[in-house]
């Protein structure tokens, strides 16, 4: 493994044109990549197809990840975490999950680490940290983030779930949908309106826990892709939530969400670039072996032109993503830069996997081939975490105002 490789795996890329060397990783990152890759190969890859069929990953996988130190990388060591603020370790996990083709099985962990845990680290008081962080690092407590509602998607400020305060308790009523880790989760960072008359300034974050009376989970939603990732509806009927489960300050929920979105969108971009590179690698392998009209499919001019186009665009995207990773590690990544990264890489990911399916011919439509699973898994990338249209609105507004 070395920083000069795309993912350090070799494959078809290593047989021909070398990718542009990556310079953002050091030896300790390469060692971490090798360890995480080995864990994926031994603990996830052999079972991924079964979990895809069952549409959920077992809790034992979370316990294994926690034991190996892959959960809570940024959590202080006193709570059982890795104690690092270096985002590059999280990026490596997203890359390896994407490149290995086990997005459904691994997506829940990146959500837990990179999207949910930052709320706990930035907003929890000491009592809350003691109560939740050790379990979240060990894999005993699985986290989720509940924003989207049946009638509210991109309009985050339009959530209708309410939390009415009575003494030391909030009474929560409402519903959420499309919640990743929705079945497995033990604690859910939930957006609620504590003052419906105040618009987005009346939004707060509450920690809803498994077993609270009135907190029910709906069905495990049957998605196009990412089948091993449990995604559920959540229902709240007069759920009494202790005021001690308020995350941060009342009325600051919208601000907290906006503050954490840059890392979420960067993480999606990191994974998108990895899947695009993997799709090209799989397609190079396939087209070099598959023959038609007496020669390898890779030798046809159309195949070479398509692969050249996809390779060049993916390399350009990777350079931009790597620079965004560096900026994020320096605390300088802007919301607009993260939005641009997510928009460009996820649209490219969908383009790459679609063109690569075409080069596989009929076999590209068979789920036993990783390219078919990647095609289904990839489609959500330009939707969740902010649609491409919203990303372009953010970037466009930064350019022209309004």
Task: State the predicted function of each range.
Residues 1-9:
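Low-complexity, intrinsically disordered Ser/Thr/Pro- and acidic-rich segments
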Residues 8-101, 110, 123-128, 135-140, ...:
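Alpha-helical interface subdomain recognition
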Residues 84-85, 155-157, 181-186, 199-202, ...:
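Short glycine/proline-enriched turns and hinge-like loops at secondary-structure junctions
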Residues 110, 136, 151-154, 178-181, ...:
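Short Gly/Pro-enriched turn/cap motifs at secondary-structure boundaries
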Residues 114-123:
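Helix-loop "lid/cap" segments that line or gate small-molecule binding pockets
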Residues 139-147, 191:
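A short, Trp-centered hydrophobic/proline-enriched beta-strand micro-motif
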Residues 158, 211-242:
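Flexible, small-/acidic-enriched active-site or ligand-binding loops
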Residues 169, 173-217:
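A short core secondary-structure module
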């Amino acid at each position: 493994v070395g920083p000069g490789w795309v993912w350090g795996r070799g494959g078809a890329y290593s047989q021909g044109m070398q990718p542009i060397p990556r310079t953002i990783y050091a030896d300790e990152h390469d060692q971490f990549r090798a360890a995480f890759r080995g864990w994926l190969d031994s603990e996830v890859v052999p079972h991924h197809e079964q979990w895809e069929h069952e549409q959920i990953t077992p809790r034992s996988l979370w316990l294994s990840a926690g034991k190996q130190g892959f959960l809570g990388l940024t959590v202080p060591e006193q709570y059982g975490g890795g104690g690092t603020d270096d985002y590059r370790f999280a990026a490596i996990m997203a890359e390896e999950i994407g490149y290995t083709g086990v997005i459904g099985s691994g997506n829940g962990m990146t959500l837990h680490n990179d999207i949910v845990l930052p709320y706990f680290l930035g907003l929890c008081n000491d009592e809350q940290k003691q109560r939740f962080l050790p379990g979240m690092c060990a894999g005993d407590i699985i986290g989720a983030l509940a924003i989207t509602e049946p009638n509210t998607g991109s309009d985050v400020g339009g959530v209708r779930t309410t939390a009415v305060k009575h003494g030391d308790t909030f009474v929560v009523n409402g519903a959420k949908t499309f919640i990743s880790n929705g079945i497995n989760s033990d604690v859910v960072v939930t957006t609620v309106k504590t003052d419906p008359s105040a618009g987005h300034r009346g939004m707060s974050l509450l920690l809803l826990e498994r077993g609270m009376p009135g907190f029910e989970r709906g069905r495990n939603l049957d998605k196009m892709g990412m089948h091993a990732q449990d995604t559920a509806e959540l229902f709240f009927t007069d759920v009494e939530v202790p005021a001690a489960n308020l995350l941060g300050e009342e009325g600051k929920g919208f601000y907290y969400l906006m503050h954490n979105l840059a890392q979420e969108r960067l993480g999606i971009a990191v994974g998108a670039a990895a899947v695009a590179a993997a799709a090209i690698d799989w397609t190079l392998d396939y087209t070099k072996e598959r023959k038609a009209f007496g020669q390898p499919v890779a030798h046809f001019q159309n195949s070479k032109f398509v692969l050249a186009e996809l390779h060049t665009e993916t390399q350009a995207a990777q350079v931009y993503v790597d620079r965004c990773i560096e900026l994020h590690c320096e605390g300088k990544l802007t919301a607009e830069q993260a939005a641009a990264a997510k928009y460009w890489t996820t649209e490219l990911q969908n383009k790459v996997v679609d063109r690569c399916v075409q080069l596989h011919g009929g076999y590209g439509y068979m789920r036993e081939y990783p390219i078919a699973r990647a095609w289904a898994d990839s489609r959500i990338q330009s939707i969740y975490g902010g649609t491409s249209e919203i990303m372009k609105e953010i970037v466009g507004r930064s350019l022209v105002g309004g």
